[in-house]
UniProtKB/Swiss-Prot annotation:
Its EC number is 2.1.1.182. This is Ribosomal RNA small subunit methyltransferase A. It is found in: Cytoplasm. S-adenosyl-L-methionine binds at N27, L29, G54, E75, D100, N125. It comes from Streptococcus equi subsp. equi (strain 4047). Belongs to the class I-like SAM-binding methyltransferase superfamily. rRNA adenine N(6)-methyltransferase family. RsmA subfamily. Keywords: Cytoplasm, Methyltransferase, RNA-binding, rRNA processing, S-adenosyl-L-methionine, Transferase.
Length: 290
């Protein structure tokens, strides 16, 4: 029997009198086949360490611990710590850290692995309400995570992996794909969770690029320009740029100059621009004094 078997999950929750906290976005997976697929998708073996976020009662952790060198699981809900100590008692390669991943000093924390030089993969069932902040925090942390295999709301997975000229494409697609490749591995129905969420989930596999997808003069400015391009999706790029940078004649003249330098039509919409287009635009705008 596995922790994720429905009868086992229910028995654990009943034994500890555990009640779900909506503020933590808690939905526990009760399908062992899906858990096996997650670990297979992540290609976990004894040559990698794993960071897990939100282990819950340890359903995914159990599968990870069987395959990985070590697992470090970050759990924000202190009520789950004694439950995890119980459900994972047979594993000596799991550390549970009772901390918000967004506040953790990851550089220091990762030194707690027995062999901190092993590649690190992130495997997690992320809370829907905080998926994007967690992902961007980890991606921008400068820690060389090799890969992310994470469950999230289907809509967010679609946005992250989207291509230009699609409804889902936006600044989040650009922010992630600049650093990583992103592909939906499979979809997870809402019916396999306790309690069942209101939407379906997807497993997104993201692999870090050796180098960012493009080279830009100023990364922060590049991300800023890409966000500006999507502020009002139905507006033209020109209207979004003017709304953001200002309507002064000198400003508009420099915007025109930057667009011309980048070879981009002012009448285009942000969703039609590739990451490379946004990179050229950001560099051109820097060149004309922004």
């Amino acid at each position: 029997m596995r922790i994720a078997d429905y009868s086992v999950t229910k028995s654990i929750l009943d034994r500890y009198g555990f009640t779900f906290k909506k503020s933590f976005g808690q939905n526990f997976l009760t399908d062992t086949n899906i858990l096996q697929k997650i670990v297979d998708t992540a290609e976990i073996d004894k040559s990698v360490n794993v960071i897990e976020i939100g282990p819950g009662i340890g359903a995914l952790t159990e599968f990870l611990a069987e395959r990985a060198a070590e697992v470090m699981a970050f759990e924000i809900d202190e009520r789950l710590v004694p439950i995890l100590a119980d459900t994972l008692r047979d594993f000596d390669n799991v550390q549970v850290v009772n901390q918000d991943i967004l506040k953790a000093d990851l550089q220091t924390q990762l030194k707690q692995f027995s062999n901190p030089d092993l590649p690190i993969k992130v495997v997690a069932n992320l809370p829907y309400y905080i998926t994007t902040p967690i992902l961007m925090h980890l991606i921008e942390s400068k820690i060389p995570f090799q890969e992310f295999v994470v469950m999230m709301q289907r809509e967010v997975a679609d946005r992250i992996s989207a291509e230009p000229n699609t409804k889902a494409y936006g600044s989040l697609s650009i922010a992630v794909q600049y650093y990583m490749t992103a592909k939906i591995a499979f979809v997870v129905p809402r019916t396999v969770f306790v309690p069942a969420p209101n939407v379906d989930s997807a497993i997104l596999k993201m692999t870090r690029r050796d180098q960012p997808l493009i080279e830009v003069q100023d990364e922060d400015f590049f991300f800023r320009v890409s966000r500006v391009g999507f502020v009002h999706r139905r507006k033209t790029l020109w209207n979004n740029l003017v709304s953001h940078f200002g309507k002064a004649e000198d400003t508009k003249a420099r915007l025109e100059q930057g667009l011309a330098l980048a070879g981009i039509k002012p009448s285009i919409r942000g969703e039609a621009l590739s990451i490379q287009d946004f990179g050229r635009l950001a560099d051109a705008l820097k060149q004309v004094g922004f």
